[in-house]
From Swiss-Prot:
Reaction(s) the record says it catalyses: RNA(n) + a ribonucleoside 5'-triphosphate = RNA(n+1) + diphosphate
Family: Belongs to the totiviridae RNA-directed RNA polymerase family.
InterPro entries in alphabetical order: DNA/RNA_pol_sf, RNA-dir_pol_luteovirus
Name by which UniProt lists this protein: Probable RNA-directed RNA polymerase
């Protein structure tokens, strides 16, 4: 049995208070320490009601502190809020001492009464930039000034217009000194919490940001108890993300050392055995079958790289490995593909250079170890065909393919025959893979292909030939998976399943219901005893699981940060608000107006789906960076979802579709940088231009090289100082129309998008607008298509997406994809996905 006092630390202040509850009622817990894990689970299940009669929090204390791994408990909304109340320390939430506000103390001294001070504080935050910069400073990172979506000044003015200056100041009085982004997140969260829970909710919102360790402890507890799978628990989960990006807690020296030190590796990785190898074989057999996977002709593959190469970061190390010299400025992988003529894979000996960097995520900074582009090319060659053949029976390589609705359906489908949910949480999963295990995985995967011997040898050698370039020298990687490897998702997902198969044995694993994606695991097991056996066995074989983050029980399930219960599935509001405020910090490019609008629509919908107050769109429409110039009424319709940018989803039950059409001037002509390579473009044109594309080029005569090169070099673009002005797009409101026809969401989940007869000719999409209907009929005739089709563009390129009303709740991404799969005007969603 775990040490209850030590375990309590994982739950912050809530853990301390639960330990006190357990200590005060120790007579009720006599005998727990003499039972094995299964017996304790069974005893708690039977005693939960009796324990609750003694103290409402006692069953939670036993589950979280006295079990090897926590047991879910059915909690009413009132019981969940009782946990929230015990998670935070209200005594630390003190109103600012106005006399300490240097430069402004005399102003506050002249103001009468608390409400007057609140009004004046609200006035200053709305109108005094110097005051905001001093007492709500932006984080000291370039992206904080450029990339955040929501800034305090505009948000405060919108808040004051809706709720009044005094209400604004009454909240801000407890936030003085917070960074700008955290204050914004707190205000947005307080809006929802106050609407749901009254004035007490405002204190919880402030405490969620002021006390991040307590917020994280509460989140851990709610997940372990299963309260994350429904309201109100889901509203409080992952509140630690409200700290925003750039928390400066990452120790990169330690991160590098933990991958290169023999002692550190020995403590972290799961040793390879023949039994583990057999489990890897079983997973690969299940997902790939027995047929040999044909890899493409190497020359055909390499000369088509303009089509398949995906952008990613490119630095001096990657350039050096490819023989590219004297390049400066922002670099991307597609640029390198243009600059290299010969296929570098046959000459590759497996040597891989890794560049460490910091990824600024909401709530924490994370170390990224990016492998060089030569390694990317080599792994892409053999891994892409495997990914295309992958069945996804249990190991999911592309979770986004079926959408969150599809994910929830799979989980719910596994629950029809009874049983217990078991959600596992690997502790720092990348660090658990030994070099020998990864080499075995790649060798076994390659053995199912017709890969040449040199490639098999180089891939195997690459695992032991990986070096992190850090502080001017190369450090040999002795174990762990690099987070920026082309095979990161493949490796994690397969080994995720293989380790559990190894722990329980192949026969038992065959009988299990399980899903694996990255480091996420969902198991449906017959009994609590099976859960206990599985957890004990994973520990026995060396899997490091965080005991405070596992969850066992009947209440609900979680997979891919989606809480799933019998009535609906729900995402986590705090994480959505954090993303809404922070924006993306992957580059320092300012957001263009149309991108800003689309981002605001998607992120506001995510917040509303997860339970945000209905007044949120009004605040966002006035404060989201990049939306100036759009009419306020238009923005409110789009952000609330009652209208859409055509084509797209409309969130209404009225069967009326309201749409806006975007009118945007063409972008400035792209100028290829002087001396830029164009090998990928020229190789593709020479080797892969189809007869249909050649005919179309003859008809339309576009500047095809410039169009192709813009996709390779356009992301880097000119610097911010020289970037040409992009004219403001205009929104044109269309007449409302009645939505005709109905589709069910589950019917659309597995349905593909109908392609046109010219869809297999990718160059055409670069200049399709230059082709007249008569031009298209001539091209369609070349491939034997229907030249008399009423809509010749649909015949050529497939039916365009249409707008549909969403009768229910769906994430914007799922809803947009479903609009592409049906011509019906209404999509019925019987099981809501609130994410």
């Amino acid at each position: 049995m775990s040490d209850p006092q030590e375990r309590s630390k994982a739950y912050g202040l809530l853990g301390e208070r639960l330990y006190a509850v357990a200590s005060a009622n120790s007579h009720m817990l006599a005998g727990y320490d003499s039972l094995d894990f299964t017996a304790r689970l069974v005893r708690l299940t039977g005693e939960a009601t009796a324990l609750k009669a003694v103290d409402p929090l006692l069953p939670c204390a036993v589950s979280l502190l006295f079990m090897d791994f926590p047991l879910q408990l059915p909690c009413t909304p009132e019981e969940t809020l009782r946990l929230v109340r015990r998670a935070y320390d209200p005594n630390t939430l003190e109103e600012v001492d106005y006399s300490t506000l240097s430069g402004y103390a005399t102003q506050f001294a002249r103001v009468k009464g608390q409400r007057g001070r609140w009004r004046h504080l609200g006035h200053l935050v709305c109108n005094d930039k110097a005051f905001r910069e001093r007492y709500f400073p932006k984080k000291k990172h370039a992206a904080a000034a450029i990339k955040t979506n929501i800034r305090l000044g505009p948000l405060a003015r919108a808040w004051a217009a809706r709720y009044g200056l005094a209400a604004l100041g009454s909240h801000l009085a407890y936030m003085v000194g917070m960074p700008n982004d955290r204050a914004c997140a707190t205000l947005l969260l307080a809006q929802t919490y106050k609407a749901r829970f009254g004035s007490e909710g405002v204190a919880w919102a402030i405490a969620s940001v002021r006390q991040p360790e307590n917020a994280k402890g509460l989140s851990n507890a709610l997940k372990a108890l299963g309260s994350n799978t429904s309201e109100p628990g889901a509203l409080f989960v992952e509140a630690n993300t409200l700290q925003g990006r750039y928390d400066r807690t990452l120790d990169m020296d330690h991160e590098v050392e933990s991958r290169c030190s023999p002692a550190a590796i020995a403590d972290q990785v799961i040793p390879y055995t023949d039994e583990l190898g057999a489990c890897i074989d079983f997973i690969l057999d299940t997902e790939l079958g027995g047929d040999t996977i044909e890899l493409p002709d190497e020359d055909e593959w390499w000369t088509s790289r303009w089509l398949w190469c995906v952008n990613g970061s490119q630095n001096a190390l990657s350039d050096k490995a490819l023989g590219i010299k004297n390049k400066s400025g922002q670099r991307y992988r597609r640029m390198a593909a243009e600059e290299v003529n010969n296929n570098p894979v046959p000459a590759w000996n497996g040597h891989t250079s890794v560049s460490p960097s910091v990824k600024l995520e909401n709530g924490k900074d994370r170390a990224i170890f990016a492998c060089d582009t030569r390694s990317y090319f080599a792994f892409t060659y053999w891994l892409t065909p495997i990914e295309k053949k992958w069945r996804g029976a249990r190991v999911i390589l592309n979770p986004g393919e079926g959408g969150l609705y599809g994910t929830a359906r799979r989980i719910r489908g596994s629950q029809t025959s009874g049983g217990v949910n078991l959600m596992l949480d690997y502790d720092n999963f990348n660090s658990q893979h030994s070099n020998e295990t990864m080499a075995a995985l790649y060798e076994k995967a390659l053995s199912r292909t017709n890969a040449p011997a040199y490639l098999k040898k180089a891939v195997a050698a690459s695992v032991e030939s990986t070096y992190i370039h850090y502080k001017g020298r190369d450090r040999h990687v002795l174990g762990t998976l690099m987070s920026g490897h082309r095979a990161t998702t493949f490796t994690n997902s397969v080994l995720n399943a293989a380790y559990i198969c190894y722990a329980v044995g192949i026969p038992a694993f065959k009988r299990m219901i399980s899903l694996h994606a990255g480091d996420d695991v969902y198991l449906r097991l017959p009994t609590l005893a099976d859960c206990a056996t599985t957890l004990n066995n994973t520990k026995r074989v060396g899997c490091r699981m965080n005991p405070t983050k596992q969850s066992i029980g009947y209440t609900g399930a979680e997979f891919l940060r989606l809480g799933i219960n019998k009535s609906y599935a729900i995402g986590y509001l705090c994480r959505a608000i954090a993303s809404l405020v922070s924006g993306s910090w992957t580059s320092l490019d300012e957001l263009q107006p149309l991108n800003a609008l689309n981002g605001a629509i998607v992120q506001t919908r995510s917040c509303l789906n997860r339970g945000a107050a209905t007044g949120l769109p009004e605040l966002i429409s006035a404060s989201f960076v990049g939306l100036r110039g759009f009419k306020r009424r238009d923005l409110l319709e789009l952000l609330t979802g009652v209208a859409t940018i055509k084509p797209g989803p409309v969130y209404t039950s009225s069967c009326v579709i309201r749409e806006y059409v975007v009118e945007q001037p063409p972008p400035p002509q792209f100028d290829v940088p002087p001396g830029a390579g164009m090998h990928a473009t020229m190789s593709y044109l020479a080797r892969h231009t189809t007869l249909v594309e050649a005919q179309a080029l003859e008809i339309a005569r576009p500047a095809i090289k410039s169009l192709m090169l813009s996709s390779s070099y356009g992301k880097a673009g000119p610097g911010a100082q020289t970037r040409p002005h992009v004219p403001m797009p205009k929104l044109r409101r269309q007449p409302p129309r009645v939505a005709v026809g109905f589709s069910m969401a589950h019917e659309l989940t597995g349905r593909g998008v109908k392609e046109g007869c010219l869809s297999g000719h990718p160059l055409l999409r670069l200049f399709e607008q230059r082709l007249t209907d008569d031009d298209l009929r001539a091209l369609v005739a070349l491939v034997g298509g229907n030249t008399s089709a009423k809509d010749i563009r649909a015949e050529a390129f497939g039916a365009e997406s249409s707008s549909s009303t969403i009768m229910g709740i769906l994430p914007h991404s799922d809803a947009s994809n479903y609009c592409k799969r049906t011509r019906n005007g209404n999509i019925i969603v019987p099981y809501h996905i609130r994410s």
